[in-house]
Amino acid sequence: MTKKLNPLEDPPTATSSDEDDVETSEAGEASDDSSSSEEDVPIKIRIKSPSATTAAAPPAKSTAVSTAADSDSGSETETDSDSESTNPPNSGSGKTIALNTVNLKKKEDPTSSSATLALPAMKSGTKRPASEAAATTSTKRVKKDEESVKKPGGFQRLWSEEDEILVLQGMIDFKADTGKSPYVDTNAFYDFLKKSISFEVSKNQFMDKIRSLRKKYIGKEGRNEPSFVKAHDKKAFELSKFIWGPKGIALDSNVKSNGVSKKSVAKKKIDSVKQELVFAGGSSTNGKKVEEDGGDDGCDWFDNSSLVRMIASLGVDEYYVKQQWSLVSVESKKIVEEKYKLLQAKELEFVLEKTKFLNEVASMFVEASKNKPLDT
């Protein structure tokens, strides 16, 4: 009959921690299954069971008892196996402690997880969203565009090169279509061309541009060999020469705003002087009616005038005089022509007065000769 050992007198030897590890891992796996949604990494905790710790407390007594009963080693071995089989309650309590420990860890984990999650939230508050950054960038671009629009340009040219050519060509076309010079009716010429200009031009701007183009041509014409930097300048000069040249279509360049030229006023003065000469003399020269000397637009009057001979009498070659006369602007030529014609009219008037004076003196001589007695 086997001897039953009292567990108090002969406690079982402390087992290794392998069983506790297995129990703890089983408890950790159970807890991991329940909290898989909260934790991704399984928690492995090693906790020794109380039976193991309590059993490990009196090792000396167990060794003493075991030495006293060395002969009964076989029975002790059987008793140890029986005690191990009777220890499941202690192992169960170890599992319970492991589960409680895991549950405590779970209760502490939400705070740590919330703390870790709170950090990105704080960082996200400091970082500016991409949409807000894009809106700020677009606002800056709009402000830059507005500033670039508000900045005034240095010099804005109203008349383009095409507009200048259009004005010159328009003067030629107006003369060809209407048969009148653009200076005769400036209002009609303005209405004829204003819609073709690239901008809304006023009457004053239109006339100022014509005067500036003529002035530019006169400055070029005074040179022996005018040079041109651009093809536009050369084309403008050729058109201007066709308009304001010696045989241009706008010979009556000195035009007032009402369309009456200085030349017409000078003609009226000459006509009045000639009429007075005719009435004072009692008859016209050679019995013929005095004709108006309005000048021939087809030829240059200077070449056939006495001015060339008078200037040449001072020691200057006639050919050189005529050549230099061709370099004078059309406007200056017209002024000289008008003055020369007025001077000729005054010369005729002086000749008439001189003739009257000589007639009176001759009449006195005749009367004196009649009253003188004849010598015997």
Swiss-Prot record:
Low complexity: bias regions: 49-72
Molecular function terms, GO-annotated: transcription cis-regulatory region binding
Record field: compositional bias (Polar residues): 87-103
GO biological process: glucosinolate metabolic process; regulation of DNA-templated transcription
Keyword Transcription included in the entry's annotation: yes
Xref: InterPro entries: GEBP, GeBP-like_C, GeBP-like_DBD
Modified residues (Phosphoserine): 49
Ranges where the record places region Disordered: 1-150
Pfam families: GeBP-like_C, GeBP-like_DBD
Comp. bias (Acidic residues): 17-40, 73-83
Gene Ontology annotations for the cellular component aspect, listed alphabetically: nucleolus
Keywords of the record: Phosphoprotein, Transcription, Transcription regulation
Family to which this protein belongs: Belongs to the GeBP family.
Oligomeric form and interacting partners: Interacts with DEK3.
Record protein name field: Probable transcription factor At1g61730
Species of the source: Arabidopsis thaliana
